[in-house]
Amino acid sequence: MIMSFFDQFLSPSFLGIPLIALAISIPWLMFPTPTNRWLNNRLLTLQAWFINRFIYQLMQPMNLGGHKWAILFTALMLFLITINLLGLLPYTFTPTTQLSLNMAFALPLWLTTVLIGMFNQPTIALGHLLPEGTPTPLVPVLIIIETISLFIRPLALGVRLTANLTAGHLLMQLIATAAFVLLTMMPTVALLTSLVLFLLTILEVAVAMIQAYVFVLLLSLYLQENV
């Protein structure tokens, strides 16, 4: 039976029970746990170095008020990277291709940054809606434009992550299907197609990590405006 290319984005279930929770919980059990030894192994050292560098790059432009968000942003980025990379494995479901999940991350965090700005420094937060030096006739128009751009931020966060991952998965499935069909008819072309698929897979690994970083980076920039 020929299945739709979009069937890979449907949530799988067994006996009516969704398997997303099990698929998400298993990888975290495989993460190494810290030891009491003075020197950690190579994997723990690499993991600690990566987390420290990410926190430094993300929190360096912020003031002290935004540093308390370091743990939340780091956990969110590691969570997104893990899900995105696991979604590249064959016969796996990628939850971050669902707009509902991405919006569930983007909307509350964006709204939190806006509310922090409104409560802590309402004058500065409202001042972002009107650039300095704006001519008087353009004030109403710019306020409307800036307000729309403010409320479209969480939608842009969710759609960006969903669209990039969905497009990559669809392209990989199309190329893999073409390589499988051409295997018996034109083996040479099928080999070249498989090589393209291998290179695209490497690219998608990079995209999976970059998109998780961009998602958290944009949230940190929104927070920086309001802290």
Swiss-Prot record:
GO terms for molecular function: proton channel activity; proton-transporting ATP synthase activity, rotational mechanism. It is a multi-pass membrane protein. The keyword Ion transport applies. Keywords: ATP synthesis, CF(0), Hydrogen ion transport, Ion transport, Membrane, Mitochondrion, Mitochondrion inner membrane, Transmembrane, Transmembrane helix, Transport. Coiled coil: none annotated. GO terms for cellular component: mitochondrial inner membrane; proton-transporting ATP synthase complex. It holds the Pfam family ATP-synt_A. One of its GO terms (biological process) is proton transmembrane transport. It catalyses: H(+)(in) = H(+)(out). InterPro entries: ATP_synth_F0_asu (IPR000568), ATP_synth_F0_asu_AS (IPR023011), ATP_synth_F0_asu_bact/mt (IPR045083), F0_ATP_A_sf (IPR035908). It is found in: Mitochondrion inner membrane. The chain crosses the membrane at residues 14-34, 69-89, 99-119, 139-159, 165-185, 190-210. Belongs to the ATPase A chain family. Component of the ATP synthase complex composed at least of ATP5F1A/subunit alpha, ATP5F1B/subunit beta, ATP5MC1/subunit c (homooctomer), MT-ATP6/subunit a, MT-ATP8/subunit 8, ATP5ME/subunit e, ATP5MF/subunit f, ATP5MG/subunit g, ATP5MK/subunit k, ATP5MJ/subunit j, ATP5F1C/subunit gamma, ATP5F1D/subunit delta, ATP5F1E/subunit epsilon, ATP5PF/subunit F6, ATP5PB/subunit b, ATP5PD/subunit d, ATP5PO/subunit OSCP. Subunit a, of the mitochondrial membrane ATP synthase complex (F(1)F(0) ATP synthase or Complex V) that produces ATP from ADP in the presence of a proton gradient across the membrane which is generated by electron transport complexes of the respiratory chain. ATP synthase complex consist of a soluble F(1) head domain - the catalytic core - and a membrane F(1) domain - the membrane proton channel. These two domains are linked by a central stalk rotating inside the F(1) region and a stationary peripheral stalk. This is ATP synthase F(0) complex subunit a. It comes from Scyliorhinus canicula (Small-spotted catshark). The gene is MT-ATP6.
